[in-house]
UniProtKB/Swiss-Prot annotation:
The keyword Transport does not apply. It comes from Canis lupus familiaris (Dog). Pfam families: OST-HTH (PF12872), TUDOR (PF00567). Its main location: cytoplasm. InterPro entries: LOTUS-like (IPR041966), OST-HTH/LOTUS_dom (IPR025605), SNase_OB-fold_sf (IPR035437), TDRD7_LOTUS_3 (IPR037978), Tudor (IPR002999), Tudor_domain_containing (IPR050621), Tudor_TDRD7_rpt2 (IPR047448), Tudor_TDRD7_rpt3 (IPR047449). This is Tudor domain-containing protein 7. Component of specific cytoplasmic RNA granules involved in post-transcriptional regulation of specific genes: probably acts by binding to specific mRNAs and regulating their translation. Required for lens transparency during lens development, by regulating translation of genes such as CRYBB3 and HSPB1 in the developing lens. Also required during spermatogenesis.
Amino acid sequence: MLEADLVSKMLRAVLQSHKNGIALPRLQGEYRSLTGDWIPFKQLGYPTLEAYLRSVPAVVRIETSRSGEITCYAMACTETARIAQLVARQRSSKRKTGRQVNCQMRVKKTMPFFLEGKPKATLRQPGFSSDFSVSKKPNPTLLRDKGNSLGVKSDAEMPPYTLHTTLRSEVFKDVPVQRHVTMSTNNRVIPMCSHPDVDPLQYVGSVFKKHKYLRFSPKASLPPPFQMHLSRTCAKEMNGNLSQTVEKPNVTPPASYTYKMDEVQNRIKEILNKHNNGIWISKLPHFYKELYKEELNQGILQQFEHWPHICTVEKPGSGGQDLLLYPAKRKQLLRSELDGEKVPPSPLPAPKQIPPLKGCPAVMPGDFKEKVAELLTKYSSGLWASALPKAFEDMYKMKFPEDALKNLASLSDVCTIDYISGNPQKAILYAKLPLPTDKILKDAGQAHGDYDIKSMIEQEYLQIEENIAKSVDTFLENTAVPPLIIPTEASPSVLVVELSNTNEVVIRYVGKDYSAAQELMEDEMKEYYSKNPKVTPVQTVHVGQLLAVNAEEDAWLRAQIISTEENRIKVCYVDYGFSENIEKSKAYKLNPKFCSLSFQATKCKLAGLEVLSDDPDLVKVVESLTCGKIFAVEILEKADIPLVVLYDTSGDDDVNINATCLKAICDKSLEAHLQIDAMYTNVRVTNICSDGTLYCQVPCKGLNKLNDLLHKIEDYFHCKHMTSEYFVSLPFCGKVCLFHCKGKWLRVEITNVHSSRALDVQFLDSGTVTSVKVSELREIPPRFLQEIIVIPPQAIKCCLADLPQSIGMWTPDAVLWLRDSVLNCSDCSIKVTKVDETRGIAHIYLFTPKNFPDPHRSINRQITNADLWKHQKDVFLSAISSGTSSPNSKSGSTPVPGSTGDNFRKSLTDAIKKSVVDHTSSLSVEELPPPVHLSKPGEHMDVYVPVACHPGYFVIQPWQEIHKLEVLMEEMILYYSVSEERHVAVEKDQVYAAKVENKWHRVLLKGILTNGLVSVYELDYGKHELVNIRKVQPLAAVFRKLPFQAVTAQLAGVKCNQWSEEASMVFRNHVEKKPLVALVQTVIENANPWDRKVVVYLVDTSLPDTDIWIHDFMSEYLVELSKVN
């Protein structure tokens, strides 16, 4: 299969597993989480990811929201629909990043093997006690009221207005087991609104306002429709469980239980309404927790078949145990009004039917309907149609017409018929109650007998509406909009709206619970205000008032009044952050139901720019680079105005926006502007990289000013006692601070933060990169801060011009010769031949003092000596020569910062110092660490999976040792950043230290390539990497004590000789980079620790009430995949 076709196929599978689409900034991450690779759009010939996506309209559909967010959706394809459905069942859209997991495994319904005991409680989630026993299977028929067990807040935590805004027409509609639930206040019955045009929210809200002292009493009754449903549910459960006594039939639930059940049902309806195409019941707890930040009681999952008004349950034909849930079908039915009496539920037909009475007189059609109407008045809860013949014969001692039940529609003029599940043969009959005075008016000969329940409710609704209109202003004033919660994810996305200074940048968070929820709310606002003719503009306004504003393009937005004039008001759009003057006629009262979503516009502070926050040039640069664009954000401090760093992730590399803006406002007059064909003397070469790139300092105004400021800072620190305020407490990438090296303070920029102790820095004025401890950095004193950060970096990146093309890659000998010749020589000279602005590099001829200005004796000509370019095998160059001056250099020259700095070397511990005694001669006899401890077969252990290829090959790490590994990695970074590189002949299958992606790892050398690269295996993480041979160093003895952490593993319980790409992708997504519990089946020992192997069962215990056995899941997946194939 061609790569383009394979990428399209994988992309479609990823998109089909997200029915609501994937935002463009998250698409690469979602694709990689499932496939292990990035989308190779550049290899396919496209400059950007978006360009590639638009080139495959048959695979992806792109939509742009009003906020500017681009969302990708899958196009329909029957070929992969089944696989995508399986992926959707198992994937988690929000990866767990915390290290705390729950290792308490629950009892499984079916076990493929005999299991005794329970796992250790070492990965307990917060809130679980360590002695927590194996939980029991939840009761499927009864949910008890125990505090917060239903996954909703307790009554005491609810704000006073929650009761008004969350209740719907299903109030107390479903309470299993109990027959009667009542509401009363001062013995007054509150009618429930059943008019089809009445908004249930407004109706219930108005009722609660009328009866503010309302309490739920266990001594009243629900309306007949609710009684009917409870009776039917109760009877169905009792008939199926006659041998089990659950509760006394007439005992009502506590009010808090009923209220919680109602809120849970409303929440489930909201979730289902967002998934019109159905949702697997196994995924519902995940969506519930993600949306409401609460756990859903597993017992509720057993109740859905008894909640037809909440959802429709469907069992797929695939034979699986999972069920599909759909939104409930809506019915427009007229319900009768509640009477104040407690009426027993309608009798169900007895198991043994009594035959019709013989010899009973025939019933005439007219008399029959009157008798049916009279009979139904005795059953205010309704009567099943199947029970009507017996009740009729028992009451009137007459024969029931045989064809009457076959044509129930003929009775519609004397009763209300409620068909169940659309079945015309299954219905409940209700009496049509006339007005209380109907009989008197009829006897008086007046023709007013056409009043029914509908007209009564209409009159009451008009009355209620007037009361609501009067109290809505007061209610709105008292309604508090919840504060905006900062996202918990590591790097959320934000849309930058506007800014007046860098300390108050207006942003909006992008995501499902933020921008997507806002768009949904605005659509509801448009629906409400456009189609409600009774909504009128506000008449009186005041500063601070919340409004709904009819903005441009017929959009309805939330706004707050800033100031008022005669016919115009100035408002701030609270979800967008900008202000506007509008006419008062466009402002309407904001309905309370639109106050539940937090104001989406918020402010942030850009880290590192605080001292220049009001600088007009800086504000202009930040505005041009950020406004109207979406960025990933690193939140450094969570506060009312959080401190953040913005990153542009649209290109190949992440761009630090804060650092880019800071460099853009540097004083251009202080730069060294190189002119082509110009000659410069007294040039200092400050750094030489392994690829031949040089960094030079050219005398200029900026360099002189920098040296003066650094000298003043040295005097300042010498005279002033060093206090904790000058220590760097919050390091972040792009921060500029000071580092002391060789008796001088130098400017450094943090380029990478490894941990709370170690980080990488680049010396701005020499180009050197090294790793240092956080404790060795210092803040720039405030009095010098603004002056020193506007000075541009004084290190100019250069390369030697006109080198022969045959030279190719620089050899260690060539780099070493160049360092010995010119490094730290302060009086070199250069001639500029070319300035490459795009790459930021100057092409130069370099001269030592005695050879200037003869071009034939330049460094460019001398370095072409053929002996320097012989590619010797396995030769390492020594960095110690970087501190050695050339014969022509002055004795007082400053050495390269960070390469051999005494102060930095002293910061290493004595233990590390003593461990580096002549590794070159003793490398072959170095001892290996002991093998890592593994549990015995049949025992559990807590593991982390850093790498997973397929169920037949993955890598595990013991969870309890991970913190020791992190400490060791920090020490290796600090040690190898300052230790000299050693000459050593690398050998295959030997252990070394290698630098991989800015971190040092313990590796096993697997092979030596001819292009200067070596293949290594990370002994602690299980990854195979290719690194430059120069980045391989001897492994110090102090780093050989901790056992190698990576152990190769195989999944037990599944048999498959060849794993497909799709199956491997599913397995990798489910276990890679996750903490799990492993049940050891077999340990295969070996003399080499990296050749040990273990066969384990894996269990995902991250869910509170369900354990996911990976082998069961993969077995089910293989069965489903075989059906597709």
